[in-house]
Amino acid sequence: MLTASPGHGNVAGRACLRTAAARVAERFFERPTVSTFSHAVAASDERLAHLRAEVALFMRDHVLSLVSHDLRSPLNAIHSWAYVLERKLDAADASAQRALAGIRSGVEQQVKLLEDAVDKTRAETKSLPLARESFPIGAPVERAVADARLAIAEARGTSIEVQSSSDAQRCDGDRERLAQAIWTMLVFATEASAPRATITLASSLENACWRVEVGYTASFAAFSDAELPHAMEPFARSQAMQPREAGRIAWALALPHRVAAAHGGTFEQSATVDGERSSLVLRVPLTAQ
């Protein structure tokens, strides 16, 4: 719970939020220790490290966004009720007026803390510029599948089946960002699946949009098994298994969500139920919006 006291409390709260954000960014992904990757070429290692860093950055921003939203709602309610109490209490009651002033001051300090420690941090990466170009949609899919196999799928014995009949269709968008988004979806699906499972990737056209759906059978045991190779940190895997409010996604999927939105598209995650089929769906317009 955030402290509302002036001075030390405010500084401590700010430091706590920044430390939490840093841990999200630094600890989200751990490099696999499976011997399968011990002799990977330097270029592949560098690319995978870059992909993990990108996912960690987007996840940090997503968590900060949730913190900002979820804390502001009760703070606004407290502030509103303070005014209601002010009209009900005796203006001559010095103790009551001091209490109300303390409530308002505490709320204002917490809002300032959110602005300084959360909103300013998010502002650095809030906008997502796109390097648009025309490309065949099969290209980022091929790249993402190859990178996902190197990152974790081969170590898990996971098969990735690609279904596509429109690889030559061209899309106007950020090819690299979309490849990162698909890679994140594939890695998440692999993490969420039992070893030696098969996950599917279907690339298709739908109402002037490019649609990518990754399907898998969720296994909570695989998510939590420390003996299995993992690309995600334990806290990220644990959060992914928690119930979600309608419209919200697992933190680990913040990158595809942001990339889809930047292209004027959508990203959806179905309910994650142990032992049942789940899906991740990304849609982006074929032409710039």
Language-model regions, residue ranges each:
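Short acidic helix/loop segment immediately C-terminal to the autophosphorylated histidine
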Residues: 86-94
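Short alpha-helical segment of the dimerization/phosphotransfer core of two-component systems
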Residues: 105-110
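A conserved beta-strand-to-alpha-helix junction within the catalytic ATP-binding
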Residues: 131-146, 179
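Conserved catalytic submotifs in the C-terminal HATPase_c
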Residues: 131-136, 159-169, 176
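Short conserved segment of the HATPase_c
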Residues: 222-237
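Glycine-rich ATP-binding loops of the HATPase_c
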Residues: 264-272
